[in-house]
Regions:
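Long amphipathic alpha-helical segments used for membrane anchoring, targeting, substrate engagement
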Residues: 1-75
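Active-site recognition of the HExxH zinc-binding catalytic motif
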Residues: 36, 98, 145, 163-180, ...
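Short pre-active-site segment immediately N-terminal to the catalytic Zn-binding motif
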Residues: 149-168, 198-204
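Catalytic Zn2+-binding segment of zinc metalloproteases
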Residues: 173-188, 221-222
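Pan-zinc metallopeptidase signature
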Residues: 241-295
Length: 295
C-alpha cells in the first residue's frame, strides 16, 4: 500500500506495555488457530462465550475479573513502531471514507477508537486477551488489537502483506459501522433467542457484511488516495481465503463441520469482500436479504 504522507488517526489509545489483567485460557488446542477463529466470530469467538456477550459487538469478547492495570516500561522495536503507525494510518483512512459515505447518506459517522495493547486488556465488554485476536466492543465503541496478531497471521496461515493487515482493521471497523446502523444490536438480540445452529447462521451473515464493508472501504480509500499497489488485492483475497470456517476447521482438526460455521466459508468471505471492493456501494451489502445458497 502507498501510505507515504498519509495522516495518522488521533483516535488511538496506546496501552502497549501496560498489564491489563490475567489472560484468559480458551482451552481448545492450537491456540493460534483458535485465535484466528475467534477473530472472525463476530461477537461469539467461541460457542461457550457467545451467550455471555450476545449484546456486545466484536470479533471476540471475554468477561473476567477486573485487575489493576500497571505500566511496564520497555522500548519498542522499529518494526513494532512502524506497524503501530501503519495501523493508525489505516484507521485514519477508514475515518475519511466512512465519514464521506455517512454524509452522502444523510448521517454523521461517529469514529471509533483503536486500542493497541499487549497480552491482556480491560474493556467495557469484559476482559480481553491477545489469544482472541482483534475484536470490537460495542460497549465502548473501541476496537482492540495486539499487534503481535499480524505475526501470527503470517507464521501460522501465510496471510502476509500490508493490505492483508489493513483488511483485518477494516473488518473490525466494519463491525463498528454495523453498530452505528443498528444492525449489530438487532442481530445479537435475535441470536440470543435462537438455537446455536440458527444463531450461527446469523453470525455468518454479520461477518460477511463486515467483510463487505472492508471491501467498500478499500474501494473508496483507493479512489481517494490511490493507495493500492500491485499485489495488494491478492494479499487481501488470500487472507480471506485462509480465514474461512472450512479452511480453519480443517487445519485445526482435519475436517470441517458446516453446522458449526459462524463466520463463513473461504469462498463466501472472498465473495463479499470482492463485491465491496468492486462496487464501493453499501447498498449491495445484502447479506441478510439473500438466501443461504446465494451467500
Amino acid at each position: 500500500m502507498k501510505l507515504d504522507g498519509r495522516r495518522t488517526s488521533s483516535n488511538v489509545e496506546d496501552r502497549r506495555g501496560m498489564s491489563g489483567g490475567a489472560k484468559a485460557g480458551l482451552g481448545i488446542g492450537g491456540i493460534i488457530i483458535v485465535a484466528l477463529m475467534a477473530w472472525l466470530s463476530g461477537g461469539n469467538p467461541l460457542t461457550a462465550v457467545m451467550e455471555q456477550v450476545a449484546e456486545n459487538g466484536g470479533l471476540g469478547s471475554l468477561t473476567g475479573t477486573n485487575t489493576e492495570v500497571t505500566s511496564e516500561q520497555r522500548e519498542f522495536t522499529q518494526e513494532e513502531q512502524e506497524l503501530a503507525k501503519f495501523s493508525t494510518q489505516i484507521l485514519a483512512g477508514t475515518e475519511d471514507v466512512w465519514t464521506k459515505i455517512f454524509k452522502e447518506n444523510g448521517s454523521t459517522y461517529q469514529v471509533p477508537t483503536m486500542v493497541l495493547y499487549t497480552d491482556g486488556v480491560q474493556t467495557a465488554c469484559g476482559q480481553g486477551a491477545s489469544e482472541m485476536g482483534p475484536f470490537y466492543c460495542s460497549g465502548d465503541q473501541k476496537l482492540y488489537i495486539d499487534l503481535s496478531f499480524f505475526s501470527s497471521m503470517k507464521s501460522q496461515l501465510g496471510a502476509d502483506g500490508d493490505f492483508a493487515y489493513a483488511y483485518v482493521i477494516a473488518h473490525e471497523v466494519g463491525h463498528h459501522v454495523e453498530y452505528l446502523t443498528g444492525t449489530l444490536q438487532k442481530v445479537h438480540q435475535q441470536m440470543a433467542k435462537l438455537s446455536q445452529a440458527e444463531a450461527n447462521k446469523l453470525s455468518v451473515r454479520l461477518e460477511l457484511l463486515a467483510d463487505f464493508y472492508a471491501g467498500v472501504w478499500a474501494h473508496h480509500d483507493n479512489k481517494m488516495f490511490g493507495s493500492l499497489e500491485d499485489g495488494d488485492i491478492e494479499e487481501a483475497i488470500q487472507c480471506a481465503q485462509v480465514i474461512g470456517d472450512d479452511y480453519l476447521q480443517k487445519k485445526a482438526r482435519g475436517y470441517a463441520v458446516p453446522e458449526s460455521f459462524n463466520h463463513g466459508t473461504s469462498k463466501q468471505r472472498m465473495k463479499w469482500f470482492k463485491l465491496g471492493l468492486q462496487t464501493g456501494d453499501i447498498r449491495q451489502g445484502k447479506t441478510f436479504e439473500c438466501s443461504d445458497a446465494e451467500l
